[in-house]
C-alpha cells in the first residue's frame, strides 16, 4: 500500500485517537498528546461524515471535559488545528479552547 505524507499523517492521527478513545473508555485521564489526538481524530471523522467547518468548530468543544484529562492539560491546549477533507476540498479547522 502506497500512502502519501498527508495520508500517513491522517492515519497516525486516527491511530493515536483510537488509543486515546480506548484509554478514556477505561476511565483513564488523557494526557496532552492523547487529548489532542482524540479531538483531532473526531474532527477528521466529523468532516468525513459531512459536518461543516462551523459545525466542527463547535463539535470540537464538546468532546472532552476538564474531568477527562490530567491536571494542567486544558491550559496547555489553547487550540487544536487539523486539515480535514471536505467535498469541496481540504480546509483548516480550528477549535479554540477545546477543553472547558
UniProtKB/Swiss-Prot annotation:
Q: What class of enzyme is it?
A: hydrolase
From the UniProt record, list the reaction(s) this protein catalyses: urea + 2 H2O + H(+) = hydrogencarbonate + 2 NH4(+)
Question: What are the subcellular locations of this protein?
Answer: Cytoplasm
Q: In Gene Ontology terms, what is a biological process of this protein?
A: urea catabolic process
- The yes or no answer to whether the keyword Cytoplasm is present is yes
GO cellular component labels? cytoplasm
Single annotated GO MF: nickel cation binding
**UniProt keyword annotations, A-Z:** Cytoplasm, Hydrolase
Q: What is its EC number?
A: 3.5.1.5
Recorded metabolic or biological pathway in which this protein acts = Nitrogen metabolism; urea degradation; CO(2) and NH(3) from urea (urease route): step 1/1
CDD domains the record matches: Urease_gamma
InterPro entries referenced in this protein's UniProt entry, alphabetically: Urease_gamma, Urease_gamma/gamma-beta_su, Urease_gamma_sf, Urease_subunit
PANTHER family in alphabetical order: UREASE
Q: What is stated as this protein's family in its record?
A: Belongs to the urease gamma subunit family.
Its assembly, as annotated, is: Heterotrimer of UreA (gamma), UreB (beta) and UreC (alpha) subunits. Three heterotrimers associate to form the active enzyme.
UniProt protein name: Urease subunit gamma
What gene is it encoded by? ureA
Amino acid at each position: 500500500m502506497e500512502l502519501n505524507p498527508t495520508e500517513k499523517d491522517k492515519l497516525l492521527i486516527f491511530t493515536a485517537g483510537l488509543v486515546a478513545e480506548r484509554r478514556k473508555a477505561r476511565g483513564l485521564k488523557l494526557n496532552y498528546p492523547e487529548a489532542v489526538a482524540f479531538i483531532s481524530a473526531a474532527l477528521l471523522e466529523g468532516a468525513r461524515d459531512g459536518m461543516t467547518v462551523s459545525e466542527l468548530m463547535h463539535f470540537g468543544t464538546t468532546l472532552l471535559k476538564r474531568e477527562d484529562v490530567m491536571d494542567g492539560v486544558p491550559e496547555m491546549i489553547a487550540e487544536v488545528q487539523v486539515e480535514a477533507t471536505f467535498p469541496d476540498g481540504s480546509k483548516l479547522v480550528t477549535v479554540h479552547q477545546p477543553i472547558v
